[in-house]
């Protein structure tokens, strides 16, 4: 009866978005009421004043008063907030090499497929990925040329070896 343990989430791929891979930790953010109010208004909600903001691991719970004076609450994705875009752009800018950038690109492709992003935010993140790729290519070309230049300089400093 108790012989075999059940393995929960056995076939679920781990770390497939920015939150579960611990690259972005939105539950540690300090989200202001004005930012939440502006974002909710941009999504089409009629917000008069923010009552309470509760940051959870994968979403945010916001209680607010609407224009009629009624209290409403809802769960919202972090991905609709401008702070999310800033954090993703910082993550992209901090990627030190092609391998890390390729991993972030793969995660972002999945994010764009699975989660609703505002179109402007999606374009800005895509442009940040492209810009970082160009920067990394330029850096790699410089290091290759520096290595070639050092190799050429090194030829002048090799000790003379006679063939006899």
How should these model regions be labeled?
Residues 59-88, 118-155:
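Repeat-associated, polar segments at repeat-unit boundaries in modular proteins
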Residues 5-83:
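N-terminal accessory interaction module
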Residues 42, 46, 94-98, 110-114, ...:
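Surface-exposed polar/charged interaction patches
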Residues 37-40, 85, 89, 105, ...:
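Residue-level detector of alpha-helical secondary structure
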Residues 79, 83-117:
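Amphipathic alpha-helical packing elements
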Residues 35, 51-58, 102-112, 124-137, ...:
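Amphipathic alpha-helical segments in structured regions that serve as interaction surfaces
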Residues 159-164:
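Short acidic DE-rich linear segments
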